[in-house]
């Protein structure tokens, strides 16, 4: 019986040593890697949640496709809706193309009209640089441009007398411009 008592007393000491060893080992692991373990658990939880929602959506899609395969009416309705959407988009695209073609046609007509006006003004001896304002003047009521006689350059008076040139020093006045001296202002190069 003493042996049984010794064995019973030896068993709790082994168990307590094992528990102490486990406690020390787990405690040191948690002390060293505790935050890493916590963050990895949180990360695993988030990843699991994301994957579970995607798996649910994937299962739902499979169920919908299986139901659609079983019901041909749904497939026909989807194809008709897709064809109607394509037709609508094609009509919108065709309308945009027509608008663009009309705009290009108007621009070409405007360019052609400006070239004709420029040619006519050159035939009359006018400058063609001021033609950008002509279409606005044509819209306003008033005398037509063909009835107005263009002035010649010889009819105009010069703004100043022909003999005055302020840079040359000629043409009157007591002061005349002279260029400054070159070289140092004072002292020699000695």
Curated annotation (Swiss-Prot):
Alphabetical list of InterPro entries matching this protein: Selenoprotein_S
Biological process annotations from GO: endoplasmic reticulum unfolded protein response; retrograde protein transport, ER to cytosol
Sites bearing Phosphoserine, chain numbering: 140
Subcellular localization, as worded in the UniProt entry: Endoplasmic reticulum membrane; Cytoplasm
Superkingdom of the organism of origin: Eukaryota
Entry's Gene Ontology cellular component terms: cytoplasmic microtubule; Derlin-1 retrotranslocation complex; Derlin-1-VIMP complex
Name of a matching Pfam family: Selenoprotein_S
Spans annotated as Disordered: 115-190
Key words, A-Z: Cytoplasm, Endoplasmic reticulum, Membrane, Phosphoprotein, Selenocysteine, Transmembrane, Transmembrane helix, Ubl conjugation
Region (VCP/p97-interacting motif (VIM)): 78-90
Signal peptide range in chain numbering: none
Topology class, membrane: Single-pass membrane protein
Transmembrane segments: 28-48
Biased composition (Gly residues): 160-174
Main location: endoplasmic reticulum
Modified how: Truncated SELENOS proteins produced by failed UGA/Sec decoding are ubiquitinated by the CRL2(KLHDC2) and CRL2(KLHDC3) complexes, which recognizes the glycine (Gly) at the C-terminus of truncated SELENOS proteins. Truncated SELENOS proteins produced by failed UGA/Sec decoding are also ubiquitinated by the CRL5(KLHDC1) complex.
Oligomer status and interactors: Interacts with DERL1 and (via VIM motif) with VCP, suggesting that it forms a membrane complex with DERL1 that serves as a receptor for VCP. Also interacts with DERL2, DERL3 and SELENOK. The SELENOK-SELENOS complex interacts with VCP.
Protein purpose: Involved in the degradation process of misfolded endoplasmic reticulum (ER) luminal proteins. Participates in the transfer of misfolded proteins from the ER to the cytosol, where they are destroyed by the proteasome in a ubiquitin-dependent manner. Probably acts by serving as a linker between DERL1, which mediates the retrotranslocation of misfolded proteins into the cytosol, and the ATPase complex VCP, which mediates the translocation and ubiquitination.
Family: Belongs to the selenoprotein S family.
Protein name from the UniProt record: Selenoprotein S
Lineage start: Eukaryota, Metazoa, Chordata, Craniata, Vertebrata
Gene that encodes the chain: SELENOS
């Amino acid at each position: 019986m003493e042996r049984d008592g010794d064995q019973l007393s030896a068993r709790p000491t082994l168990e307590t040593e094992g528990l102490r060893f486990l406690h020390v080992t787990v405690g040191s692991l948690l002390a060293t890697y505790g935050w890493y373990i916590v963050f990895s658990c949180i990360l695993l939880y988030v990843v699991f949640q994301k994957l579970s929602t995607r798996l649910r959506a994937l299962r739902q899609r499979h169920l919908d496709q299986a139901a659609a395969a079983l019901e041909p009416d749904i497939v026909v309705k989807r194809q008709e809706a897709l064809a109607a959407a394509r037709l609508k988009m094609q009509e919108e695209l065709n309308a945009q193309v027509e608008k663009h073609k009309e705009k290009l046609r108007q621009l070409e007509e405007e360019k052609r009209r400006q070239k004709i006006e420029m040619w006519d003004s050159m035939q009359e001896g006018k400058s063609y640089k001021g033609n950008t304002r002509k279409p606005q003047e044509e819209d306003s009521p008033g005398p037509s441009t063909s009835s107005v006689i263009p002035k010649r350059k010889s009819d105009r008076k010069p703004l100043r007398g022909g003999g005055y040139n302020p840079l040359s020093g000629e043409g009157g006045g007591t002061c005349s411009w002279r260029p400054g001296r070159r070289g140092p202002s004072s002292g020699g190069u000695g």
